[in-house]
């Protein structure tokens, strides 16, 4: 209950003053706490902090609830249970405390904020039983509204008798006096607000949502509106995971009060001709519809990051210095960080500690680790920003631990967002413009990339995204901004995030005979924006399979014993925070080495078997620079050294060079035919007609020869590509030179044998080469669809000579086939 004054009808100028003795006692005890509580050095703890409040921009004193409990247990209990009731009195005690020591403006208000509450509640635990209690909740900010002035205490002028009515408290909506305080005047409605003499405070609404860790399985995240006032405004941005300390309150639901349906309900009772209402009393059906529209809102007095020291928004803070980070740590923690920086095997130990449950895939672990350290963002003299964040894409067969990497990073990084490409749209990934229910203004609601600002955005099933949605993140991946022009809102928002994506190959399994670009459903612009591509192939290897199976069984049977970490996750977070404040410069020696390695990549691009997965561009040069800077940061170096560039080049080389391609099986069609023949009517079944009994004892003479499996004819992939390119080039040359462009299959075989005449030394070799070229042509026609057979089947007058056409058809190149560079 707040201090209130009310005028009794006919009581003249006498006012009945209602006193809240409990609140006044709390005010006195809280003033004693501010004046008497001392820190370990014997100084009054809050004296200096209170004296700073005389500055114009300051008005809030943050008090530790632990100190309050130590000073007076009964006072802390009363404040916790009756917070909304006693809060104005606590603010008055603070104003008295400051006023006794410094001169302050009379109109200035002061506010108290509490932190370090012992218990933290989830959003779904907030019920009506917690209204008015001091509570601490946590959640992730998903929407922020602009800051507005809020009327907290109004001064009104009576338009009938000109009486000035001061200090009319506003109850979360515009509240006029019930009646004029002049006993002669009976005005109840005609009042004018005097804005010059009223008191306003900064006011901001934010919407928070349950974090993924708090969410029960299968539940939809709940959200809650939080009201911030005074110094608390602009202290939380979209994507922050914060603790809010305050109380749960009930406010009128303005959006429900102003809905068209409610308005129509009240306007339907119109007066008739005789002044009577056309409708009678309709019972309880509409009783109180407009009066019972209330909702729960959290009024916060203090906002703090969920893990303020080595979590929350400070993990990726670029403005930290080594000294400020050292001051946040204990002596023991700082010694551990220093010990880690001197570790000779730091690179390997960090990888094994970060992903202890994933066997193998060491290159992927190294790439993801360097992504967490990141490069150095730069701004050119013209104002162009060069990103420092590293983007990584993992492509691989099913069950190769792609999603596990994403989940590990999401759990480790305090500002990481996990999403699925198939279930996400462009607005959900970038940002959406939505209309506010109360003010009807358009506000921006953060998407996954904005929520992961200064963090990591993990996108699973990246290849399943629609092309329109992939285009939406082009700008975010390179410029690290999101531009929005919708519904009159034009804004450029920050999305300084690293993207860790996982994608599946097109056919479900990675085809080694094709390049990376042909294996995944991603456009060239998206692929060029990734710094690293890692390809995981599920191979049948007895040693590897045994090691993986042993690791999985160990995890299921002895979870604690099987996880072997050199460093704990908290130690890695502390080391990451310390290492990221380094901004290494590239030395002249490293600069020359980077240029040399880039030239090697460019020369290798498109040269024979080592042809790269996609075009090497300047973006790959920038990727090498970022990876080199991340290596230097990891070793806490102020300068990029050639050994850092060498490791960056090695990692980049892993993703750029084509995965080792197997030999091409030219007897694939015969193997397939054999499988068909071995069906129910083949070896295991019974043939329709018995085989003729010939040879010894009724068995075939060639049975012993046929029983031995014949080795399939295989050709090296590079040789297969060379022969196919020769055939395509020859046929296209014939198309350009002659009118009759098509060649018969036999003519094409004879042409090829003449071309390689110098390589043939014997009749047996000639037969072998002829067999190979015939198999290659068959595969190009029926499997790769590079060549097309022209027949006369079905044409009029085509009966004559049709058999020869079937046996020896004309061949032309598929017009849709593009010869690879």
Curated annotation (Swiss-Prot):
Any one GO CC term of the record: nucleus
Modified residues (N6-acetyllysine): 643
Motif (Arginine finger): 528-531
Phosphothreonine: residues carrying this PTM: 278, 791
Compartments (UniProt record): Nucleus; Chromosome
Domain MCM stretches: 346-553
Any single biological process term in GO: mitotic DNA replication
Post-translational modification: O-glycosylated (O-GlcNAcylated), in a cell cycle-dependent manner.
Transmembrane residue ranges: none
Keyword tRNA processing: no
Disulphide-bridged cysteine pairs: none
Residues given in the record as ADP binding sites: 619, 622
Positions contributing to ATP binding: 359, 399-403, 504
CDD domains (UniProt xref): MCM6
Keywords: Acetylation, ATP-binding, Cell cycle, Chromosome, DNA replication, DNA-binding, Glycoprotein, Helicase, Hydrolase, Nucleotide-binding, Nucleus, Phosphoprotein
Function: Acts as a component of the MCM2-7 complex (MCM complex) which is the replicative helicase essential for 'once per cell cycle' DNA replication initiation and elongation in eukaryotic cells. Core component of CDC45-MCM-GINS (CMG) helicase, the molecular machine that unwinds template DNA during replication, and around which the replisome is built.
The protein's name in its UniProt record: DNA replication licensing factor MCM6
Species this protein is from: Bos taurus (Bovine)
């Amino acid at each position: 209950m707040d201090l209130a004054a009310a005028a009794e009808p006919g009581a003249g100028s006498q006012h009945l003053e209602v006193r809240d003795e409990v609140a006044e006692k709390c005010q006195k005890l809280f003033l004693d706490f501010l004046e008497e509580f001392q820190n370990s050095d014997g100084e009054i703890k809050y004296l200096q902090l209170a004296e700073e409040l005389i500055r114009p921009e300051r008005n809030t004193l943050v008090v530790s609830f632990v100190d309050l409990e130590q000073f007076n247990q009964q006072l802390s209990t009363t404040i916790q249970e009756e917070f909304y009731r006693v809060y104005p009195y606590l603010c008055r005690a603070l104003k008295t405390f400051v006023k006794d020591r410094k001169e302050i403006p009379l109109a200035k208000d002061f506010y108290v904020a509490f932190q370090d509450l012992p218990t933290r509640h989830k959003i779904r635990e907030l019920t009506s039983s917690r209204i008015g209690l001091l509570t601490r909740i946590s959640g992730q900010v998903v929407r922020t509204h602009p800051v507005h002035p809020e009327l907290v205490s109004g001064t009104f002028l009576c338009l009938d008798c000109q009486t000035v009515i001061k200090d009319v408290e506003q109850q979360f909506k515009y509240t006029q006096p019930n009646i004029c305080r002049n006993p002669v005047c009976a005005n109840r409605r005609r009042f004018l607000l005097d804005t010059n003499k009223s008191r306003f405070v900064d006011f901001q609404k934010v919407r928070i949502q349950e974090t993924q860790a708090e969410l029960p399985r299968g539940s939809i995240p709940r959200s809650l509106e939080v009201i911030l006032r005074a110094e608390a405004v602009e202290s939380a941005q979209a994507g922050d995971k914060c603790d809010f300390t305050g109380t749960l309150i009930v406010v009128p639901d303005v959006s429900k009060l102003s809905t068209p349906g409610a308005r129509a309900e009240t306007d339907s009772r119109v007066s008739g001709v005789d002044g009577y209402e056309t409708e009678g009393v309709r019972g309880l059906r509409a009783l109180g519809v407009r009066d019972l529209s209330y909702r729960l809102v959290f009024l916060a007095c203090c906002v703090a990051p969920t893990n303020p020291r080595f979590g929350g928004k400070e993990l990726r803070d670029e403005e930290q210095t080594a000294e400020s980070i050292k001051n946040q740590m204990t002596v023991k923690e700082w010694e551990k960080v220093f010990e880690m920086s001197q570790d000779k095997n730091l690179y390997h130990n960090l990888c094994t500690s970060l992903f202890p449950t994933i066997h193998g895939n060491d290159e992927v672990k190294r790439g993801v680790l360097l992504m967490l350290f990141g490069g150095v963002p730069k701004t050119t003299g013209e104002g162009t920003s060069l990103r420092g964040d590293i983007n990584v894409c993992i492509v691989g067969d099913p069950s190769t631990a792609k999603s596990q990497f994403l989940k590990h990073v999401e759990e480790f990084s305090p500002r990481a967002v996990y999403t699925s490409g198939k279930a996400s749209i462009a607005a959900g990934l970038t940002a959406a413009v939505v209309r506010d229910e109360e003010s009807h203004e358009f506000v921006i609601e953060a998407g996954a990339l904005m929520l992961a600002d200064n963090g990591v955005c993990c996108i699973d099933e990246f290849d399943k995204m629609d092309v329109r949605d992939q285009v939406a993140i082009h700008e975010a991946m390179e410029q690290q901004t999101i531009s929005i022009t919708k519904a009159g809102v034009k804004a450029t928002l920050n999305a300084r995030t690293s993207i860790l994506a996982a994608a599946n190959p097109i056919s479900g399994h990675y085809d080694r005979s094709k390049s990376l670009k042909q294996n995944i459903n991603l456009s060239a612009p998206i692929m060029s924006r990734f710094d690293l591509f890692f390809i995981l192939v599920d191979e049948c290897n007895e040693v590897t399979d045994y090691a993986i199976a042993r690791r999985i069984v160990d995890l299921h049977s002895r979870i604690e014993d099987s996880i072997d970490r050199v460093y704990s996750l908290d130690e890695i977070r502390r080391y990451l925070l310390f290492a990221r404040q380094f901004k290494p410069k590239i030395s002249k020696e490293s600069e020359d080495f980077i240029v040399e390695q880039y030239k090697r990549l460019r020369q290798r691009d498109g040269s024979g078997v080592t042809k790269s997965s996609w075009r090497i561009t300047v973006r790959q040069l920038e990727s090498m620079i970022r990876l080199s800077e991340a290596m230097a940061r990891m070793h806490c170096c102020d300068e990029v050294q050639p050994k850092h560039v060498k490791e960056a080049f090695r990692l980049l080389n892993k993703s750029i060079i084509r995965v080792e391609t197997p030999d091409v099986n030219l007897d694939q069609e015969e193997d397939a035919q054999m499988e068909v023949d071995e069906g129910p009517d083949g070896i295991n079944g019974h043939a329709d007609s018995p085989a003729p009994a010939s040879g010894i004892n009724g068995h075939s003479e060639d049975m012993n020869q046929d029983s031995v499996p014949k080795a399939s004819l295989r050709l090296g992939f590079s040789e297969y590509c060379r022969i196919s390119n020769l055939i395509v080039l020859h046929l296209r040359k014939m198309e350009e030179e002659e009118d009759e462009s098509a060649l018969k299959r036999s003519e094409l075989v004879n042409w090829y044998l003449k071309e390689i005449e110098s390589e043939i030394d014997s009749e047996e070799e000639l037969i072998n080469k002829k067999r190979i070229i015939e198999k290659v042509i068959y595969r190009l026609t029926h499997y790769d669809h590079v060549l097309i057979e022209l027949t006369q089947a079905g044409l009029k007058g085509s009966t004559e000579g049709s058999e020869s056409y079937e046996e020896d058809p004309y061949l032309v190149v598929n017009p849709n086939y593009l010869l690879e560079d």
